[in-house]
């Protein structure tokens, strides 16, 4: 029973990380498609780039596992 719960939690975490990666990537693309001006959009682009990078690392670790 506990193994089943642990397996279910792992699947939920995996899908959550991939969803975050997908949403952050799309958001970053949208920011760059809006006629990117570094001075105006750096406040949006930098946090999104960090989230995309960290979630990509987390996804790679999960896939390798």
Curated annotation (Swiss-Prot):
Alphabetically ordered keywords of this record: Cell membrane, Membrane, Transmembrane, Transmembrane helix
Subcellular location: Cell membrane
One Gene Ontology CC term in the entry: plasma membrane
Taxonomy, superkingdom: Bacteria
Keyword Transmembrane in annotation: yes
Bilayer-spanning residue ranges: 12-31, 41-63
Major site of localization recorded for this protein: membrane
Topology in membrane: Multi-pass membrane protein
Protein name: Uncharacterized protein BH0234
Source organism of the structure: Halalkalibacterium halodurans (strain ATCC BAA-125 / DSM 18197 / FERM 7344 / JCM 9153 / C-125) (Bacillus halodurans)
Lineage, highest ranks first: Bacteria, Bacillati, Bacillota, Bacilli, Bacillales
């Amino acid at each position: 029973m506990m193994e089943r719960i642990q397996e279910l939690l792992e699947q939920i975490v995996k899908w959550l990380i991939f969803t975050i990666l997908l949403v952050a990537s799309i958001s970053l693309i949208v920011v760059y498609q809006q006629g990117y001006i570094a001075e105006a959009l750096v406040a949006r682009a930098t946090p999104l780039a960090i989230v995309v990078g960290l979630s990509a690392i987390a996804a790679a670790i999960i896939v390798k596992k």
